Structures are given as C-alpha cells and as structure tokens.
C-alpha cells in the first residue's frame, strides 16, 4: 500500500483535534514536572550569582574557554545547574512520550482515556524510555555540536525508536537499530516531519523572550507546554506512519 504524507498529516490532525484536551493536559503536566524538578535541583539564586562575579570570565572567546576561566566554585555551580536542567528535561520528555504513545494505543483500542490514565499506563516502560531518550539525545546533540547535518540525520533515523520500544516491547539498542533501518527506508515520510519539528522548536526558543512579562516559573511552564504539544504532534504522526508501514 502506498503511503502519502498528505493522508498521514490529515490523520494526525484529526487525532490531535479529537484528543486535544487530553493531549494538552499531558503536555501541561509534563511541563509542570519539568519545571518543578528543575527548580528543586537547581542551585539557589545566591549560588547562581557566583557565576557573574569576578573579571576572570571577561574576554572568553567561546564556551570551553569560558569554563576554563571559571573558578572551581563557579564550575561546580554551572555543573549542578546543567545537570538539573538535563535531568528535569529527560524526565519530562520520558513521561510525555510514554503518556502520548499509551494514549494513542488505548484510544485506538476503543477506550476512553484521561491524561492521568495514559501517564499511569506508561509507568512500566518509563525507565527504558528514560534511558533511550538519554542515549538518543546525547547522540543527536553530539552530532549537532560537530556538524549540523549529522545531528539532524541522527534525529531522523532514531525517530521510530520510542515507538518500537513501547509498541513492540523492544530493548533500547534493538529499538535504535530497527529505527535506523526503518526510518532510512522511509526517509521521504520521516525527514520532513523531523526537520519541521526541529525548526518549530528553534522558533519557540527564539520567541521565548516574548514570555518575559510572565513570572519565570509561569513562563517556563507555558514554553514547555507549547514545546510538549509540538512533540506530541510529531509522535502522533510517527506512530501513524509506523502502523501504516507495518500493515
């Protein structure tokens, strides 16, 4: 059966519209979890103020030189802030991916599903999802740091990995290997969606300053919720493509 991107876009839009309230609640809950965890594990404002102290950072040409010029205390604060941001983001993303994929599964099986039920149903796969997202995020970001194209390519070929892990109960490495083969064979369907998702995420970061009127925590929840909705839309599209390929 020939699969057209247009028909998949239409199916994705219909599902997203019909389940919008549930998806919005999942996105909002995951955003709240991300912000709360980030706030709980981040250094205090007093500790963060250390990063702006002293003249040792002036004239640093790049990130690596900036870190090298920091005092050990400043490096420790920066490391803790980065670790808190990374950990909270990974947990939020894992819950989002698990919740959305289980929502799709349950709705497709004819069940009425709430946001909490979808997230609760995803609990058994969350540890594996967390590790999978950690590995894939690391690979994609390393590719982005070296040269942009390898990072984008890795994001494309690993796109089906979370779906295979949840839908087919695969292991982490098995899902990554299978995703690479399947996504590469269906590049015309996967690549535009992933590139569109990356562009949308980038634009959201560029317009993040528009939320400056809100308090920092509220602004962070709003931005994360919008980002989660974009990711949920991509997951629905990829799940639909995957099921059509399998059939």
Curated annotation (Swiss-Prot):
Q: What are the record's GO terms for cellular component?
A: plasma membrane
Q: Kindly name one Pfam family recorded for this protein.
A: UPF0259
Question: What membrane topology does this protein have?
Answer: Multi-pass membrane protein
Subcellular location per the Swiss-Prot or TrEMBL entry: Cell inner membrane
Keywords assigned by UniProt, alphabetized: Cell inner membrane, Cell membrane, Membrane, Transmembrane, Transmembrane helix
Its signal peptide is: none
Where primarily located?
membrane
List membrane-spanning regions.
20-40, 87-107, 119-139, 146-166, 189-209, 219-239
Which InterPro entries has this protein been placed in?
UPF0259
Q: Does the keyword Transmembrane helix apply?
A: yes
User: What family does the Swiss-Prot or TrEMBL record give for this protein?
Assistant: Belongs to the UPF0259 family.
HAMAP family reported for this sequence: UPF0259
Task: Spell out the protein name for this chain.
Answer: UPF0259 membrane protein KPN78578_12180
């Amino acid at each position: 059966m020939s699969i057209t991107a247009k028909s998949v876009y239409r199916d994705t839009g219909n599902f997203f519209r019909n389940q919008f309230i549930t998806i919005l609640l999942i996105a909002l809950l995951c955003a709240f979890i991300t912000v709360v965890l980030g706030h709980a594990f981040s250094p205090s404002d007093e500790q963060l103020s250390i990063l702006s102290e002293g003249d040792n950072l002036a004239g640093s040409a790049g990130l690596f030189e900036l870190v090298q010029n920091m005092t050990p205390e400043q490096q420790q604060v920066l490391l803790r802030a980065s670790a808190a941001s990374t950990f909270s983001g990974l947990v939020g993303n894992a819950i989002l991916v698990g919740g959305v994929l289980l929502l799709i599964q349950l709705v497709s099986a004819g069940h009425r599903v709430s946001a909490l039920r979808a997230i609760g149903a995803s609990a058994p796969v969350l540890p594996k999802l967390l590790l999978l997202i950690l590995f894939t995020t690391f690979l994609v970001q390393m590719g982005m740091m070296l040269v942009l194209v390898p990072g984008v390519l890795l994001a494309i070929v690993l796109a089906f990995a979370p779906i295979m892990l949840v839908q087919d109960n695969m292991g982490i490495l098995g899902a990554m290997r299978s995703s690479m083969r399947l996504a590469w064979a269906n590049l015309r369907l996967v690549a535009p969606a992933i590139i569109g998702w990356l562009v949308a995420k980038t634009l959201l970061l560029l317009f993040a300053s528009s939320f400056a009127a809100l308090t920092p925590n509220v602004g962070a929840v709003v931005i994360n919720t919008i980002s989660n909705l974009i990711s949920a839309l991509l997951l629905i599209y990829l799940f639909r493509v995957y099921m059509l390929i399998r059939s």
